[in-house]
Amino acid sequence: MHRKTLAELAAGLERREFSSVELTQAHLARIERLDPALNSFITTTPEIALAQARAADERLAKGEAGPLTGIPIAQKDIFCTKGVRTSCGSRMLDSFVSPYDACVVERFNAAGAVMLGKLNMDEFAMGSSNETSYYGPVKNPWNTATVPGGSSGGSAAAVAARLVPGATGTDTGGSIRQPAAFCGITGLKPTYGRVSRWGMIAFASSLDQAGPMARTAEDCAIMLQTMAGFDERDSTCVDRPVPDYRAALGNDLDGLRIGLPKEFFGEGLDPAIAGLIHAAVDEYRRLGAIVREISLPNMHLSVPAYYVVAPAECSSNLARFDGVRFGHRCENPTDLADLYTRSRGEGFGAEVKRRILIGTYALSAGYYDAYYLKAQKIRRLISEDFRRAFEEVDVIMGPTAPSVAFEFGAKSADPIAMYLSDIYTIAVNLAGLPGMSIPVGFSNGLPVGMQIIGGYFSEDRLLNVAHRYQQATDWHTRTPAGIAD
Amino acid sequence: MEWETVIGLEIHAQLATRSKIFSGAPTAYGAEPNTQACAIDLGLPGVLPVLNREAVRMAVKFGLAIGAEIAPVSVFARKNYFYPDLPKGYQISQYDLPVVARGKLSINVDGKALTIGITRAHLEEDAGKSLHEDFHGYTGIDLNRAGTPLLEIVSEPDLRSAKEAVAYMKKLHALVRYLEICDGNMQEGSFRCDANVSVRPKGQTKFGTRAEIKNLNSFRFVEKAINHEIARQIEILEGGGEVIQETRLYDSVKDETRSMRSKEEANDYRYFPDPDLLPLEISSGFIEEVKATLPELPDAKRDRFKAQYGLSDYDAEVLTASREMADFYETVVREAAGDPKLCANWVMVELSGLLNKDGLEITASKIDAAGLASLVRRIADATISGKIAKQVLETMWNEGGSADDIIERQGLKQITDTGAIESIIDQIIAANPEQLAQYRAGKDKLFGFFVGQAMKATQGKANPAQLNELLKKKLQ
């Protein structure tokens, strides 16, 4: 059953080829067997899963099922789940059991999906390799000596290893797209405001966005259909109708205007990846698309701007983890300052501390204008670059990441090198645009992802563009050796 | 050297919304600790704020009432600092772009009219409370207050004495209650004040170094703390010292201010726009909608009272000091259908005396406006004299009942029958031949003696005007 895509499983459930309980048990068994080597789950929730599966089977029997009813999924451990530990990959929240569900979790529950557990991630979503998790790194199923990418590395690895047909991720600077690329799966970061952030533990509020991670664009469409939509509890969530994503998948791509930004193909890009992207673009030409080179002149400013804005917001967002009301508290604090410094010192890992320090500095009196305000100006310039580009093209394509998955430890000593692995994805978050990554081939036996960027709220088009490519190619069906069975 | 004081006030008015500024939790005061705080107020991971429309409406109402500009776009910012009763580690406030800017308020001090500038008024959330008692060396945290909406009203440094500061604060206090945007309860902290105080040699234009005195929660403390601070600063300056910029706390028990933290120790709040909240846009339509709900404001009401009821400046000022007082007075006038000045006197002097004695607000008066009006009517129609009326009022206050019932039951009806009064006068004159002789010999003072005797004989019920007239005639 694990070989089937989410859409195929939904069809199987509908036809009663198997029950949700059977499906759930099969996936739980795979997790038990394969995940010790991968470490993609922080928490598994078999009891909840089986109860949800039984309820789903009843719904299916009554004919009250939707496309996600009875489908096993897993949540990135950044989403609050009622009664279940929600750790955010941090020692700080190792003991935190959320009293409420995130909006995304509520919506999957309402749709009748089955939650298998909570997925590993970089601590507080800060990282590009999953090496910052308090629960240890996730291994890339394609080569367990390499990283799965981050921060949604657990989600990407679990989907790639067929432990779950679909998982949620969050993307602040590439955290859905880059691990999707490293693990050879399909991931979509929606437009900022498309999916509610209620109950999603904030890293950088103006950049964070939840999205689906699955094997195919079609599966992402099914998941996004449930995730997207207005939620009055999130003031940044946009009240705008959600289109029928699956209905748009079949549209043909005749005359589709594709832009290739020259800034995405310059220095620092692995030539093998460049070759695969061009090959994928050629495939789009065959599907009727028109390709032209474009320019996003301020792209080189995106990483520095991001590493001011995101740490600034995180330094404030993470202030609530103070050992007073919930989360880690140090033993026997002597006074208030000791309680704060030791609880936070012990609870947070090195990368989180680095970003809190950078952000605190950037917001300090006397530095605010030079850093934070300037970064916000750059953000506007980058948005403007995209706005101009979308006057000429419908979608932008390029590499998702400059390299394939790297080995553990390769970049962990050099934060700048690590930050540059998000060089192509960060601008999309700064502009608030939707972006996808789809598998387009392999280099040295590791998957390569291509990024597709669209205008605001063009998720339907992105999914359509990705789906048509997946209809014509089979890169997305490749399965890591050793876990195929 | 002659010194001039410069004062600016920052007043925090708790807005009278039913729910909190960024959550749906109730704002009720006095509940069991941590029972009025929801996930958002607790700052749990993943929660997000949603702005309370009612709080914005109230801020706009205030802005309109002080003739201020209502910002078409204002921004919520995070003020970052660590404190156990600040759940998120930041307070959501407004910084660069407040919702209300550049208003003014007129005050009256010793008969002098002054206009005080209001720099800005912005919306923000309150923090919780740290409880240091009864926890065996630990500190308790009560987050019921966390997230309560506040309007911080910042004045220009236009005030020149503690007296002016108090007059300004009282005026503002009346205004927010007129507008029904704040209950004004100072004991519960619904209306509190920080004062920025500095002194400078008279004639100097540059401001002196200021000290900020925190958390003054009564008019009396504001006056005492400011006066104390002025004296402290002058003493330092006259001794050749320098005032240092710092935050000071007023100790009402010792009647002194003491240093809380210096400028160097001050927090760097690292303000930045809150990314969880979009800029607040206020349309002209919304402003018009709010404008339509504005009540008659204190100054307008005072002027109307003077014109409509012929009251003095002082009486009009006192009667419009609160909306409740003004409403009470106008009900008395309407019900009594008579002399507005007489009504003013009975509300301001006699009833207020009883209220003060029992420490009650006009809204808790034991005699309602209609009851007082019926008493005033009996004075106006000469059923009883003013002196008897005071007696009736006391009975109404202490025992309840209507004025007419009390007058009837106690037989207090004034004697207006000329024949009856004349016969009493005749008896008194007959009984006091000596005094009569002296009076007729020119000792005019004895007129009072005869009045007294007549009142004594009638238990004060003789109509005073009639009695005077008849006595004069008979004594001639």
Swiss-Prot record, chain B:
BP GO terms, sorted: glutaminyl-tRNAGln biosynthesis via transamidation; translation
EC number: 6.3.5.-
Sorted UniProt keywords: ATP-binding, Ligase, Nucleotide-binding, Protein biosynthesis
Organism, as annotated: Methylococcus capsulatus (strain ATCC 33009 / NCIMB 11132 / Bath)
Record function comment: Allows the formation of correctly charged Asn-tRNA(Asn) or Gln-tRNA(Gln) through the transamidation of misacylated Asp-tRNA(Asn) or Glu-tRNA(Gln) in organisms which lack either or both of asparaginyl-tRNA or glutaminyl-tRNA synthetases. The reaction takes place in the presence of glutamine and ATP through an activated phospho-Asp-tRNA(Asn) or phospho-Glu-tRNA(Gln).
Keyword Disulfide bond: no
Catalysed transformations (reactions): L-glutamyl-tRNA(Gln) + L-glutamine + ATP + H2O = L-glutaminyl-tRNA(Gln) + L-glutamate + ADP + phosphate + H(+); L-aspartyl-tRNA(Asn) + L-glutamine + ATP + H2O = L-asparaginyl-tRNA(Asn) + L-glutamate + ADP + phosphate + 2 H(+)
Family that this chain belongs to: Belongs to the GatB/GatE family. GatB subfamily.
Subunit structure: Heterotrimer of A, B and C subunits.
Top-level EC class: ligase
Pfam families: GatB_N, GatB_Yqey
HAMAP family: GatB (MF_00121)
One term of GO molecular function: ATP binding
Protein name as catalogued: Aspartyl/glutamyl-tRNA(Asn/Gln) amidotransferase subunit B
